[in-house]
């Protein structure tokens, strides 16, 4: 059995290398400084707007900050765009940012992200050579006291955000796109799919023109009812990820 994956082991602080946080190129807009507050002025992308062609990920990341293609931006702190190697052979797609991601602006830095790191290490895949993103770029939540609880995005919200994922894939040109969970799979395939039907198989997906692997989202491992079940689900996730070893270099 592989190393333990209890909740305590996943809760340690995760720190991303600051060198990976590229400052977006500021283009076709202007900014004002008011004391220490910088206000960016740019046009908003509404639901009816097609995305423009972007020269690179920095341009796409900056433009995504003004996305209004669905209402989720209204309650989110910020758009959480993808992060990582812009020439990665592997792109990992999750569901949406969580509370930690919404606050930091980076994908997969909360408990699910730390568990993903453990699984990638077990599968001998270097996360720093990968690109990680989400199918939906804003945190959807509902309040419970002082907490913000994750709420699953609707199919309309997934479809509204799908052009951003397609843009990331087109700019990176990865060899494999890895969908973590049902929402990611729906975005990749362009509609709902049963995870049981596609999990653990390298499959060509015509709509994005890429080989894809669908597996479980790390958060589903954390939700398993007891330590033994969590270990079983973690081991299964690692086994799926090992199918990617030939693309991990």
Regions found by a protein language model. Name each.
Residues 2-249:
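A polyanion-binding, active-site-adjacent surface
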